């Protein structure tokens, strides 16, 4: 199998968050006895996993940065990073972040510059600056592109070079539905003709070097292609999940924090209403839908930054407390504390 990786990534944004580390990369490095994998990041980590753990025999990375300032920081011994991550990653991560932030001050952002700790060629990858060269005869094309509105212009340069039946994936910078539309405009309806292309996701749900997981979107690829990618993901990432394409963003992107809170609220509310009060599920669903729809309508009407002007958070303290029983009691006390701090 040939894997084409389009976009090598840059560590500066990972360092800037102040919370990421190399836990998964170090785990893989130890599993396969290749310390140089320990400080890979972004698509390079996922490419190394696919090569070493899933048997992908050809990996090509394409990025214009290879003709510019692709910078490899070699201040840290891979073995030291691995040992630190066995105990507490924060024993070494502050020094790594400090160095990255220092280098980032002088280095241009992608595609003119990028920060890495291992060169892809040292992992047995081929490199190129030509996306068309990379995707030629590729079975799996993993994209790691900038913001969604820039992607059609990038993709249209190589879309004619993708072989029929190839799997094409995106990560965190575009929804699957929008990613699919780019290919649909060129190839037509891929849902009923997936042999043309199989469009889905290989979304890590976090920085790949930190967590071993991948999320695969269903809807725009054949069942065979989804299953193939799922099996590769299980072998390479350790944990793989299939989910409807429209849920990928809410589950994997920044709004996952809100999705988690909302979903936990729905599930605990449902159980309190149906199991304790004995109300039918249809009634619980009707009330839940009203809550979600009206809060969304309020946000759309006044803006997320002005919601408190129309609905005082304190207004819920004297009403929601009457539902503080059963499963809802698992989360409501913490919710009340948050609302109390924000009430007018």
Swiss-Prot record:
Q: Which Gene3D superfamilies match?
A: Hmd, C-terminal helical subdomain, NAD(P)-binding Rossmann-like Domain
Tell me which HAMAP family the record gives. HMD
Q: What is its EC number?
A: 1.12.98.2
Sorted UniProt keywords: Methanogenesis, One-carbon metabolism, Oxidoreductase
InterPro entries in the cross-refs:
6-PGluconate_DH-like_C_sf (IPR008927), HMD (IPR010062), HMD_C (IPR004889), HMD_C_sf (IPR038182), HMD_N (IPR055205), METHMP_Hmd (IPR024190), NAD(P)-bd_dom_sf (IPR036291)
Name of protein? 5,10-methenyltetrahydromethanopterin hydrogenase
Protein family according to the UniProt entry: Belongs to the HMD family.
Q: EC class of this enzyme? A: oxidoreductase
Q: What does this protein do?
A: Catalyzes the reversible reduction of methenyl-H(4)MPT(+) to methylene-H(4)MPT.
| Catalytic activity of the protein | 5,10-methenyl-5,6,7,8-tetrahydromethanopterin + H2 = 5,10-methylenetetrahydromethanopterin + H(+)
Which SUPFAM superfamilies does the record match to this protein? Answer: 6-phosphogluconate dehydrogenase C-terminal domain-like (SSF48179), NAD(P)-binding Rossmann-fold domains (SSF51735)
Pfam families, from UniProt? HMD, HMD_N
Which terms under GO biological process does the entry name? methanogenesis, from carbon dioxide; one-carbon metabolic process
Q: Name one GO molecular function term.
A: N5,N10-methenyltetrahydromethanopterin hydrogenase activity
Pathway noted in the entry: One-carbon metabolism; methanogenesis from CO(2); 5,10-methylene-5,6,7,8-tetrahydromethanopterin from 5,10-methenyl-5,6,7,8-tetrahydromethanopterin (hydrogen route): step 1/1
Organism in which the protein naturally occurs? Methanothermobacter thermautotrophicus (strain Winter)
